[in-house]
């Protein structure tokens, strides 16, 4: 399928090219670009593209790095994607003083355009996760998210609330993009979208969200409050102030917002100019944007994205990695699958689930890595007893690691995830046993060796008993020897041809019982179990003639 793409140049801009992409297998070779991870369908249902999300956040370079998720949300057609593209320029050129780029360079990255109809749908993330060194030397992963605008003509209230709420739940820095002023309905919508957070806070006694930044675009009153963060702080203090003469509803809105976010700030940005607002062919060139806007833009973007300003994503006091963020994405989207907005408290349940799943994934990954070091692909064969001892030791360490992680939901809620962890570790252990056994040169010869031993023993017994006149026992041994020889030939044919693999597995099971335990009872029990499980193999190998089966059924009726 043909699709237009733009290659990034040294300024963070793009030159447009056309590529032919016919399948998802070719996606990894694409240049960095926006990837839609939350899809809003025509029936207003939501779908998470887990494949795309995993490809971006679970890449080896970033999956174990603590993540900073920056999101821009707000009403549609207010310049969110336009702003995101300046963020991209900064992230690609932050070492440069003049990071905004060439004044004749079109602005590209996240899809945007002028006009009155919506452009972005669902949630898009930039396919390249940026690795940034914070002032303390820690390297963090920075993820940029662009969201569908709220309250467009094609979206329901549920659509708008879901996208805004989900982006707020996932992000560590939420930019609330507003036009001209912070009006009362803007605050009420924010209250609606973060209602989940208020209820979650009542359960955990922690503020559910981190940083909220009111970005007021097209600010027209610099004589009252100056452009920038200082003027924004004074303006926001006045706008969110709770006073005794306010109506209770207005007080509740402001108290609610303060109770949901750890940090709240504001930035006032001037209008970009009439050329931007009225030119249908405006493509983002800086030369067409007012100097006052560019001046404040150069302050805003570093204020948001400089290393010292980055807030690592935290949930319940725990710093989240890219791997953990994937689990939260999956858990949160589940609560939005129904036809109506879920009860806000379900966000706490989803958070607790994701929290526990992330702990399970971390503990399981720890077990997996250490077992790979012990008996991985390039390691020699390990004695089964030693392997079991290492397994029990590492399993105990993984369980201890799981229990040591701070998790929401309480001990009772976490118990089933502990059981899930133990079950998954035991399944991994079985795989490691099989992998380890495959390295044993004698393991491959176990079945034929066992059958040869049976043939030899029955041959000797048949000869001795025949010599002393015990013909019945000799005949029985000869019969067993013949059946064993047929079994050996059958096993060899199965190994050669690859047919009747289930029958081959039955033969291996019986031979393993004789080899490992040396117990006739164990062998007979396994033979009986295998026969009961795979009866259809007998009927497939020795089909009953139709006439004979008909006669038998008629006799039964009589």
From Swiss-Prot:
It is an enzyme of class 3 (hydrolase). Residues 347-438 are annotated as: 3HB (three-helix bundle) domain. Residues 1-27 are annotated as: Disordered. One of its GO terms (molecular function) is GTPase-dependent fusogenic activity. Its EC number is 3.6.5.-. GDP binds at residues 77-82, 148, 217-218, 276, 279. GTP binds at residues 77-82, 217-218, 276. Residues 412-439 form a coiled coil. The chain crosses the membrane at residues 450-470, 472-492. Phosphorylated. Phosphorylation, by different kinases, of the N-terminal hypervariable region (HVR) regulates the ATL1-mediated membrane tethering step. The modification Phosphoserine is found at residues 10, 22-23. It is found in: Endoplasmic reticulum membrane; Golgi apparatus membrane; Cell projection, Axon. Residues 439-447 are annotated as: Linker. Residues 521-558 are annotated as: Autoinhibitory domain. Residues 64-309 form the GB1/RHD3-type G domain. Monomeric and homodimeric. The homodimer, transiently formed by two molecules on opposing membranes, is the active form mediating ER membrane fusion. Interacts with REEP1, REEP5, RTN3 and RTN4 (via the transmembrane region); these proteins are involved in endoplasmic reticulum tubular network organization. Interacts with ZFYVE27; both proteins are involved in endoplasmic reticulum tubular network organization. Interacts with ARL6IP1; both proteins are involved in endoplasmic reticulum tubular network organization. The N-terminal hypervariable region (HVR) regulates ATL1-mediated membrane tethering by organizing ATL1 into a lattice structure on the same membrane. It does not affect GTP hydrolysis or membrane fusion. It has no effect on the GTP hydrolysis and fusion steps. Atlastin-1 (ATL1) is a membrane-anchored GTPase that mediates the GTP-dependent fusion of endoplasmic reticulum (ER) membranes, maintaining the continuous ER network. It facilitates the formation of three-way junctions where ER tubules intersect. Two atlastin-1 on neighboring ER tubules bind GTP and form loose homodimers through the GB1/RHD3-type G domains and 3HB regions. Upon GTP hydrolysis, the 3HB regions tighten, pulling the membranes together to drive their fusion. After fusion, the homodimer disassembles upon release of inorganic phosphate (Pi). This is Atlastin-1. It comes from Macaca fascicularis (Crab-eating macaque).
């Amino acid at each position: 399928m043909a699709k237009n793409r733009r290659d990034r140049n040294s300024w963070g801009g793009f030159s447009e090219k056309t590529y032919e992409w016919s399948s998802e297998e070719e996606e990894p070779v694409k240049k960095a670009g926006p990837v839609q991870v939350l899809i809003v369908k025509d029936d207003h249902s939501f779908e998470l593209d887990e494949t795309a999300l995993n490809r971006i956040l679970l890449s080896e370079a970033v999956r174990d790095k603590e993540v900073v998720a920056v999101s821009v949300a707000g009403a549609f057609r207010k310049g969110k994607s336009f702003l995101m593209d300046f963020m991209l320029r900064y992230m690609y050129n932050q070492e440069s003083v003049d990071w905004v780029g060439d004044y004749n360079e079109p602005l590209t990255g996240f899809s945007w355009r002028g006009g009155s109809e919506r452009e972005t749908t669902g949630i898009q993330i930039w396919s390249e996760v940026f690795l940034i060194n914070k002032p303390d030397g820690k390297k963090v992963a920075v993820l940029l998210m662009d969201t569908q605008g709220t309250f467009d003509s094609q979206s329901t209230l549920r659509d708008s609330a879901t996208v805004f709420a989900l982006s707020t739940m996932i992000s560590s820095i939420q930019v609330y993009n507003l036009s001209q002023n912070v009006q009362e309905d803007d605050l009420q919508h924010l209250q609606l979208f973060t209602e989940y957070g208020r209820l979650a806070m009542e359960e955990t006694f922690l503020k559910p969200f981190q940083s909220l930044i009111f970005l007021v675009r097209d600010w027209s009153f610099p004589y009252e409050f100056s452009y920038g963060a200082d003027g924004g702080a004074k303006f926001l203090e006045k706008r969110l102030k709770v006073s005794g003469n306010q109506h209770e509803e207005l007080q509740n809105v402001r108290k609610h917002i303060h109770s949901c976010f750890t940090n709240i700030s504001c930035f006032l940005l001037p209008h970009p100019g009439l050329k931007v607002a009225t030119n249908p062919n405006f493509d983002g060139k800086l030369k067409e944007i007012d100097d006052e806007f560019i001046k404040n833009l150069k302050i805003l973007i570093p204020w948001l994205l400089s290393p010292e300003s980055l807030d690592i994503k935290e949930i319940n006091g725990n710093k989240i990695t890219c791997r953990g963020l994937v689990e939260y994405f999956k858990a949160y989207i589940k609560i939005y699958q129904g036809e109506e907005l879920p009860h806000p408290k379900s966000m706490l349940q989803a958070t607790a689930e994701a929290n526990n799943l992330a702990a399970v994934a971390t503990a399981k990954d720890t077990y997996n890595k250490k077992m790979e070091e012990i008996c991985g692909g390039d390691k020699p064969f390990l004695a089964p007893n030693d392997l079991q001892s290492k397994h029990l030791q590492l399993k105990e360490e993984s369980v201890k690691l799981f229990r040591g992680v701070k998790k929401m939901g309480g001990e009772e809620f976490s118990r089933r995830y502990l059981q899930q962890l133990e079950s998954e570790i035991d399944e991994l252990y079985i795989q490691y046993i099989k992998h380890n056994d495959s390295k044993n040169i004698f393991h491959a010869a176990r079945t034929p060796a066992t059958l040869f031993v049976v043939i030899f023993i029955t041959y000797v017994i048949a000869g001795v008993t025949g010599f002393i006149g015990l013909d019945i026992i000799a005949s029985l041994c000869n019969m067993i020897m013949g059946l064993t020889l047929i079994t050996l030939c059958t096993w060899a044919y199965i190994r050669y041809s690859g047919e009747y693999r289930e029958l081959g597995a039955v033969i291996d099971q019986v031979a393993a019982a004789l080899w490992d335990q040396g117990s006739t009872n164990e062998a007979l029990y396994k033979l009986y179990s295998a026969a009961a499980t795979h009866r259809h193999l007998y009927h497939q190998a020795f089909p009953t003639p139709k006439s004979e089966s008909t006669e038998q059924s008629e006799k039964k009726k009589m």
